Amino acid sequence: MAYVLVGFMGVGKTTIGNLLARKLGLKFIDIDEQIELEMNMKIKDIFEQYGETYFRTLEHNILKQHINMNIVLATGGGIIENPNNISLLKENKINIWVDTNINTVYNRIVNDVNRPNAMNKSFDAIKDLYFRRRSRYNEIAYISVNNDDELSDCVQEIHNFIIAEEGN
C-alpha cells in the first residue's frame, strides 16, 4: 500500500514526499517525474505535443503501476481529473491531501514554465481551478494537512499519523 500525496499544484507534495519517504525508510516516486523519465520529455512538452488527455493516460498508468507498492507516492495536482484515478485512489488506504493557502500556491506557480495548467493564467483562473478540485481531493483523502507553516511540522504531522495508524 502506498502513502499517496494528493493536492493542488505547488502545495509541496514532492518536497514533503521526499522528506516523508526518508523518515519512513521508503522509496519515493513522484508521478510527474516518473512520466518525464519514461517519456524523456518535460511535462510541458508532453502537453504541447500530445495534449492533456494523453498526459492523463500516462499519469493513470503510473498510478496504477505503483499504488500497491510500499512507497511514498506524490501525484500531480490534476490526478483527480481522471475518474479512473479517483476509483484507484478510493481503494488505497492512506491518501494524504496536502493543502496550502491559494495566495501561496499562486505565488509559487505563476511563473513556473513547467506547469502547463498554470502558465499565463490569472489569479482568478488559478483560484477557480483550485476550488473546483478541492472537493475531489477531500473525497479521496484519509487525512488532510496544511502546509502553510513549517514544512518540517507538516512532514512530522503526517509521520505521526502513519505511525499511529500502523499501531492500530
UniProtKB/Swiss-Prot annotation:
Major enzyme class: transferase
Keyword check for Nucleotide-binding: yes
Pathway: Metabolic intermediate biosynthesis; chorismate biosynthesis; chorismate from D-erythrose 4-phosphate and phosphoenolpyruvate: step 5/7
Catalytic activity field: shikimate + ATP = 3-phosphoshikimate + ADP + H(+)
Domain of life where this protein originates: Bacteria
GO annotation terms (biological process): amino acid biosynthetic process; aromatic amino acid family biosynthetic process; chorismate biosynthetic process
Molecular-function annotations in GO: ATP binding; magnesium ion binding; shikimate kinase activity
Residues noted as binding Mg(2+) in the record, renumbered to the chain: 14
GO CC, any one term: cytosol
Annotated residues for binding of ATP: 10-15, 115
Protein localization: Cytoplasm
PROSITE patterns in the cross-refs: SHIKIMATE_KINASE
Keywords assigned by UniProt, alphabetized: Amino-acid biosynthesis, Aromatic amino acid biosynthesis, ATP-binding, Cytoplasm, Kinase, Magnesium, Metal-binding, Nucleotide-binding, Transferase
Entry EC no(s): 2.7.1.71
Subunit record text: Monomer.
Function: Catalyzes the specific phosphorylation of the 3-hydroxyl group of shikimic acid using ATP as a cosubstrate.
Family: Belongs to the shikimate kinase family.
Annotated PANTHER family: SHIKIMATE KINASE, SHIKIMATE KINASE 1, CHLOROPLASTIC
Protein name per UniProt: Shikimate kinase
Organism: Macrococcus caseolyticus (strain JCSC5402)
